[in-house]
């Protein structure tokens, strides 16, 4: 779903399978723009090698959400599964929690608690652009984990403080 997407909006009224917004065979990148809103949960490898765009998941993501991510944003209102952000270069994963069995990857650095103004700006923009499809979960005070430090480490995993 949305593999290779470069713009527009996809709204899924239920759950989604593997690789939403992810890599398509023969391409260098997954999603390169646009927005995907999934009302249910998303399976493994959501946003694999995503370059830009936004994926909003009302439920939880499966294992390896944002694996090898190059940019863009994932909002996981139900939480993220194991290995979220593994080998992420840039991008943001905003999650409500880590689901059972998931840990912060060892190659992510705890950067402390922050009140990020950009989250307010993003929430306002999503509300204006998406209306009722906008994320319902947008905390302003978050604990920021930078990574993946096994690569260039410019990505981030944000969890409520």
Positions of predicted regions on the chain:
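Short acidic, glycine/serine/threonine-rich loops at helix termini
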Residues: 50
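Hydrophobic packing positions in regular secondary-structure scaffolds
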Residues: 20-21
């Amino acid at each position: 779903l949305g593999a290779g997407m470069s713009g527009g909006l996809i709204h899924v009224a239920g759950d989604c399978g593997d690789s939403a917004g992810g890599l398509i065979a023969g391409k260098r990148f997954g999603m390169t723009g646009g927005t995907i809103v999934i009302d249910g949960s998303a399976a493994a490898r959501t946003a694999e090698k995503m370059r830009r765009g936004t994926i909003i998941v009302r439920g939880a993501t499966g294992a390896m959400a944002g694996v090898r991510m190059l940019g863009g944003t994932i909002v996981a209102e139900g939480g993220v599964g194991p290995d979220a952000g593994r080998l992420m270069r840039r991008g943001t994963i905003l999650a409500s929690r880590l689901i059972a069995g998931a840990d912060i990857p060892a190659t992510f650095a705890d950067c402390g608690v922050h009140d990020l103004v950009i989250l307010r700006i993003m929430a306002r923009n999503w509300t204006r652009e998406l209306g009722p499809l906008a994320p319902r979960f947008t905390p302003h005070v978050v604990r920021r984990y930078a990574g993946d430090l096994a690569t260039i480490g410019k990505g981030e995993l944000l969890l409520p403080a």
